[in-house]
Amino acid sequence: AHDRAFSRGVLVDLARPLLRIPNLAIHLNRNVNSDGLVLNAQSHLAPIFGLATEEPESLRDLLVDELAARGAPTRHEDIVSWDLSLYDVQGATVSGASSEFIHSARLDNLASCFAATQALARAPQTHATTRVIALYDHEEVGSRSAQGAYSPFLRQVLERIAQAGDALDAEAFARAISRSFLISADMAHAIHPNYADRHEPNHAPVLGGGPVLKTNVNQAYATDGEGAARFAALCRDVDVPLQHFVVRSDLPCG
């Protein structure tokens, strides 16, 4: 809502199939399997919202209806701007002979976000250390948004925490960082039985085989010898198997 004094943000989840990006029928693109699927972001990725009519329903109409259904009637002119996020509304499911597979959108990397959040919530309280998790957004578009990994927000928060005891101690943050241990948690590629040649032959993680330490010759991952040793020790302490993943030297990593 908006008036001359302020604007107020409201989260709205329409939670139903609304848009679709239809692919071209193979009858009109018969070489797609041999030439590969080539998409132009401008021409081919526009989602279909509805049929063209004399009075098409607008996004603002949908928002007004949704807010009214929530008991928050809103005028069209009160909706002045929005940030849109599209997501697959198909629910997660399990499959496999023993129901061992999870099929879901956004596993990369909501799986690590969920595990980190659960670990932080269940960690014993102590005043000796400050436990922090950072869950960033917009990795796939460059991480340069206000909530992306390039944002200064986390550093500013940590600096304030470090200096909370003594605001005049300019070195408190630097000392805290030097005594800290960071884990960059992401998803790992298990070996794909149909494309086994895309994996480094001596390092092929399997699903359900335990967490994975990822190493890249071009230093694209955070793993180094000391960090790997610490992580391996943590796994041993809780009797969790550890796997290793190495990117093929002739392929880039994700």
Tell me what each language-model feature is.
Residues 1-253:
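N-terminal hydrophobic/helix-forming segments and targeting peptides
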